[in-house]
């Protein structure tokens, strides 16, 4: 078992220290820096979020293309092998590796859709920037006029302008606040859902690819040995099960599945392909049918309210177990 220290997050609960984020390079000059300068000061931080998200999406896309090429080369390499197991398994694993690359490409689409939502916040910040600047100029003008001549008639006009500007600014600030909360929530909920779906797909595909690799006999062979003959039947069964698991993963949630899972666990949904695998024999009398994989559904990724409910139930069960242990300890002492 790994040490508990290895299971900790590499970052603290906040990236800020004294209100600043360490290691954030803002002074590096580039073409994208020129684009950033075209936006108001108030919207440059949101512009950096959009820009850095774009580079991250491109990196995921390149990784997906690389995996698809890897799968193609793997299948091409195995086609020339005289070993039947290598020939067949390399082709099938190549298919699954290519599918892993395809999941990256699909993830990038969802990633960009949610990243672009931040443009609404940037546009709102750009639109409210002139009002903020005008308000600040009026405040500075009033301060200068008061220092020069406290009885100046211009003060009344400037103060009236400031009242009107602050009223307009108040409406704009409220619109910005509403837009920021709505877009931030929608964007990152969609983004985290995309991460969860990508992880489930990769978990499913990588598991079956690992099971295919297990079918290869890696024992050392010597001249004159007669290794066991390879049968494509088990590899074909694994591929069929993989297809079925991926289909279940992408199947929409229905009221029937929700009610069925709700009877077992109130906070889970049966919309995921999160799978657990167990060895099962189709025919107990035939030893050749041993270790055939069988898939069964387990709980899916929880939504935020469901996760909170699960957390509350989990804490409650832990508290009850702790009370039982304390009562048992007390009864032991009395005895």
From Swiss-Prot:
Query: GO BP, one example?
Result: ascospore-type prospore-specific spindle pole body remodeling
Report whether Nucleus shows up as a keyword of the record: yes
Q: Which InterPro entries match?
A: AH/BAR_dom_sf, PIL1/LSP1
Q: Which domain of life is it from?
A: Eukaryota
What are the recorded GO MF terms, alphabetically?
Answer: lipid binding
Q: Which UniProt keywords apply?
A: Cytoplasm, Cytoskeleton, Meiosis, Membrane, Nucleus, Sporulation
Q: What is its main location?
A: cytoplasm
Which Gene Ontology cellular component annotation is one that this UniProt entry carries?
meiotic spindle pole body
Q: What is its subcellular localisation?
A: Cytoplasm, Cytoskeleton, Microtubule organizing center, Spindle pole body; Nucleus membrane; Prospore membrane
- What is this entry's stated membrane topology? Peripheral membrane protein
Disulfide bond sites: none
Nuclease in keyword set: no
Pfam families hit by this protein: Pil1
This chain's function reads: Has a role in nuclear division during meiosis II where it stabilizes the proper segregation of the spindle pole bodies. Also has a role in the formation and extension of the forespore membrane.
Protein name as annotated: Meiotic expression up-regulated protein 14
What organism is listed for this UniProt entry? Schizosaccharomyces pombe (strain 972 / ATCC 24843) (Fission yeast)
Lineage in the entry? Eukaryota, Fungi, Dikarya, Ascomycota, Taphrinomycotina
Q: Which gene encodes it?
A: meu14
């Amino acid at each position: 078992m790994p040490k508990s220290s290895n299971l900790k997050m590499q970052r603290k609960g906040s990236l800020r220290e004294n209100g600043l984020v360490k290691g954030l390079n803002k002074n590096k000059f580039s073409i994208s820096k020129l684009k950033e300068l075209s936006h108001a000061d108030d919207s440059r931080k949101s512009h950096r979020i959009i820009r850095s998200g774009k580079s991250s999406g491109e990196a995921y896309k390149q990784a997906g293309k690389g995996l698809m090429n890897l799968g193609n080369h793997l299948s091409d390499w195995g086609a020339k092998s005289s070993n039947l197991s290598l020939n067949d398994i390399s082709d099938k694993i190549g298919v699954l590796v290519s599918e892993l690359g395809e999941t990256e490409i699909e993830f990038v689409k969802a990633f960009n859709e949610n990243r672009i939502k931040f443009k609404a916040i940037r546009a709102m910040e750009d639109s409210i920037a002139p009002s903020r600047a005008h308000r600040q100029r009026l405040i500075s003008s009033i301060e200068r006029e008061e220092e020069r001549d406290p009885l100046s008639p211009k003060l009344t006009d400037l103060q009236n302008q400031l009242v009107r500007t602050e009223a307009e600014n108040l409406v704009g600030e409220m619109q910005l606040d509403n837009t920021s909360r709505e877009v931030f929530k929608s964007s990152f909920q969609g983004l985290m859902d995309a991460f969860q779906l990508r992880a489930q797909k990769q978990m499913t595909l990588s598991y079956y690819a690992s099971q295919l690799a297990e079918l290869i006999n890696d024992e050392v062979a010597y001249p004159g040995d007669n290794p066991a003959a390879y049968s494509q039947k088990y590899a074909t069964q694994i591929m069929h099960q993989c297809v079925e698991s991926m289909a279940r993963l992408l199947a929409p949630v229905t009221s029937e599945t929700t009610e069925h899972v709700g009877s077992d666990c109130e906070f889970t949904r049966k919309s995921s392909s999160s799978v657990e695998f167990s060895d099962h024999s189709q025919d107990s009398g035939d030893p050749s049918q041993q270790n055939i994989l069988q898939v069964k559904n387990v709980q899916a990724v929880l939504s935020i309210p469901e996760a909170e409910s699960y957390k509350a139930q989990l804490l409650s069960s832990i508290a009850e177990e702790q009370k039982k242990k304390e009562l048992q300890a007390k009864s032991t002492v009395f005895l």
